[in-house]
């Protein structure tokens, strides 16, 4: 059994086949969506699965062109416990939309402020410090930092906030990724694929590098999921 806490299976060539095989193996997948309309289209296709979930997302890279979807996000948010992919992206290609990204994220976080029954997967590229500040401001309790690539020094603050990190095989292949992996406490590590966008997404290879078992990841995952019950 593997646990994939960040996968875009709706973007796979054959999503139904992908999640059906995962379900048959007992694998757990939390699917991301990039927009509310994608969640609305995909939700019906995961009904009945025991180990497969779909998250309601609003990707920061699409914020500038997708403001019309925010009302749909507000409507759909009551139908799921899983939120993602949301966040901020201040990398050079998207830095010109910084203000509208922040405005959009504030809108979203205001809808789930203090909600212990939501699990949130966040994108934080080049905006890790700003994103953490907003998550704390809006008292978002259950957060997974997906494919973290920020400063080593901020990891302590993220851990102190009670948050987790989802890590993937690609991180094991770069010097910065390996340094980050060596810094995150093992009890705060979850696994992800980020497929199909990430071409290096073999979760078992990630586990081998980390010297962690599937059971250890499952225990971390259960600790996080159990928070959502209270």
Description of each model-found segment:
Residues 1-230:
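Mid-domain alpha/beta scaffold segments of enzyme catalytic cores
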């Amino acid at each position: 059994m593997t646990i994939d806490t960040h996968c875009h299976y709706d973007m796979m060539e054959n999503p139904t086949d992908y999640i059906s095989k995962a379900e048959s193996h007992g694998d757990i997948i939390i699917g991301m969506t990039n927009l509310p309309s994608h969640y609305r289209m995909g939700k019906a296709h995961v009904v009945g699965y025991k180990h497969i979930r779909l998250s309601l997302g609003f990707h920061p890279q699409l914020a500038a062109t997708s403001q019309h979807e925010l009302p749909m996000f507000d409507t759909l948010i009551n139908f799921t416990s899983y939120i993602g992919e949301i966040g901020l992206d201040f990398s050079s290609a998207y830095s010109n939309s910084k203000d509208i990204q922040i405005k959009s994220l504030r809108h979203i976080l205001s809808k789930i402020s203090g909600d212990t029954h939501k699990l949130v997967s966040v994108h934080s590229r080049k905006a890790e410090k700003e994103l953490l500040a907003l998550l704390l401001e809006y008292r978002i309790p259950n957060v997974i930092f997906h494919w973290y690539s920020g400063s080593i020094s901020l990891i302590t603050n993220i851990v102190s906030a009670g948050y987790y990190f989802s890590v993937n095989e690609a991180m094991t292949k770069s010097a910065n990724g390996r340094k980050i992996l060596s810094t995150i406490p093992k009890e705060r590590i979850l696994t992800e694929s980020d497929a199909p966008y990430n071409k290096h997404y073999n979760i078992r290879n990630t586990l081998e590098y980390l010297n962690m078992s599937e059971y250890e990841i499952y225990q971390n995952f259960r600790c996080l999921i159990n928070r959502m019950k209270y």
